[in-house]
């Protein structure tokens, strides 16, 4: 049982990294097993069935920790009286930045799903993945942005979420607009990112012509 659990975790780690690097369709189940050091060609199918099952397993493993961290940040912010737009945006972004800091490929994996058009796989993972997006979004609209039309708000919030994931994935990949390719420290980059995303939500709307 312990060996099976270890093998399963190793396969999830390997798949997360390879999917992030090459995309869902860029790597086979067999390649994942081999990269994880497994000699049984069918080991990945045995544990997860198919790629959709493997993607769900990656989500379940990471999203539990990420969402628990978000809940803790939300609770701490509320207790401290910090419940502004920036504070709420920060509770979404910081747990993702912490995944980057810890060296996990989860954010790059999420970015790959976005850019490769695999929203169906994201939705197949269920409410555990989307609950923080919806919960923080509802609180933002209810407390701060209820003057925005509903569709406009959710469009902006989705842009914020997608931008956060893409920006952190690029950071982890080493991309930088700074001279010499140097990067800001992750903490400073994250703070700047939260500032920019907050500005996206608070931007004035352009009147219809």
Named regions from a protein language model:
Residues 91-101, 109-118, 139-142:
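Helix-loop "lid/cap" segments that line or gate small-molecule binding pockets
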Residues 87, 91, 105-112, 155-163, ...:
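Amphipathic alpha-helical interaction segments
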Residues 1-6, 208-209:
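N-terminal intrinsically disordered/low-complexity leader segments
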Residues 8-13, 25, 48-75:
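An amphipathic alpha-helix adjacent to DNA-recognition modules
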Residues 71-106:
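Hydrophobic alpha-helical connector segments
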Residues 18, 25-53, 57:
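Helix-turn-helix
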Residues 98, 115-123, 153, 157-181, ...:
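Amphipathic C-terminal alpha-helical segment
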Residues 83, 105, 118-145, 155:
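Amphipathic alpha-helical packing segments from all-alpha helical-bundle domains
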